Every structure is written in C-alpha cells, then in structure tokens.
A protein has these predicted regions:
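Boundary/linker segments flanking structured domains
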Residues: 1-56, 60-194
Length: 194
C-alpha cells in the first residue's frame, strides 16, 4: 500500500483544514524534520483508504524529529525482524554456530500493522523546543486523554479492559495556550468525525 506522511505545526492549523486537504502540508523528509530535532509533543492522525481521520497516537520525546522518522519507518514496514544474527560475545569474538533473532518491539509491531490498514498519516506538532522539556509528559497525557488516542499507552498497557478510566494526573500545570490549542484541535476533530 502506498502511504502519505505529512507534518504540520499546531500553530498553523487556524489557516489549514487539516482533515479535508492534506496536500498543502509538508511531506516528512529529512529536510522538513530538521526543525523538529528537539523536545516536544506530537499527535498522529491516520486515515484508511475508505473512512474518516482517526487520532491514532500521541507522543513526546527529547527529539521528536528522530522519533517521527522512526515511526514513519515502522508504519511503512521498513523495520523487519532480523533473523540469524551471529552471536558476538563481550570479547568481540563470534561464537560458532550461535545465532539469534531480533524481533520487533510491541511499538514496532503495532505500527507495522497500522501501516497495513491506514494509508494517510499526519503528524501534528503540538509544541517543539527546549522550553517544553519539563512539561512534555503532561502535555502528552492531556492531548492523549482529550483525543482518546487509539493506541496511546501511559507507560504500559492495561492487562484487562476498563471503563471510566480517570483523567491523568499532573496536567494542571500545562500552559493555558497549549491547553487551548489542544482543546481547539479536539473540537475540530470531533466535528469532523460526526
């Protein structure tokens, strides 16, 4: 399946109809990601060949550019299980007749499957820069909670299905401008999926 990967800053969404025209957004390339090689938070929206846009994931990182590039590789199916890797011990010696396999991480497995079902993806950068270093985890939680991001996990998955999951803690100190930006995106998103 051919994929489309785009990126946009949340600040630019006032002038862009995110869910109806992604052609005007930047393609994800090494060059377009250069300004994102820092702390930040992003939201991933995806669309199947037939259907509406869905909020798939929210993430935060000390280098969101590198993380998004890695996610694109996973979604594209570029990261595969590696089989038959020669075992090299701590002394730099190959151990004859010993090989091992490197399997995909749970994140890579999920993204690989998502990439088989969805063909269009937009990463929205909520915030980017060193000033968000201490706040990024709280912003991620707030955005994921508000969007109910389909594949988001706060550290680990639940072992059993639950109802009425409570609002995450530590979100009260998020700057009002960031909260308002997220709330406005959620409003537009909810109007889109109705």
């Amino acid at each position: 399946m051919e994929h489309v990967f785009k990126i946009v800053n949340a600040d630019d969404l006032d002038s862009i109809d995110l869910f109806n025209n992604i052609d005007n957004l930047k393609d994800i390339t090494g060059e377009s990601m250069a300004g994102y090689m820092t702390y930040g938070v992003w939201i991933l929206f995806g669309r199947k060949p037939v259907g509406v846009w869905e909020c798939l994931q929210v993430g935060q990182s000390s280098n969101i550019g590198s993380e998004i590039i890695s996610d694109v590789k996973c979604l594209s199916g570029e990261i595969k299980t590696k089989e038959g890797i020669e075992y090299i011990n701590q002394f730099g010696q190959k151990v004859p007749n010993y090989t091992y396999n490197v399997y995909l991480s749970p994140r890579e497995q999920i993204y690989e499957r998502v990439g088989k079902e969805y063909n269009k993806f937009v990463f929205v950068c909520i915030c980017c820069g060193e000033i968000y270093k201490d706040e990024k985890k709280a912003i991620e939680k707030y955005a994921a909670w508000k969007f109910r991001a389909l594949f988001w996990r706060n550290g680990g998955s639940f072992k059993e299905a639950k109802e009425n999951v409570q609002e995450p803690e530590d979100i009260e100190n998020i700057k009002p401008t960031i909260k308002n930006s997220i709330d406005n995106m959620v409003k537009k998103y909810n109007e889109h999926i109705k």
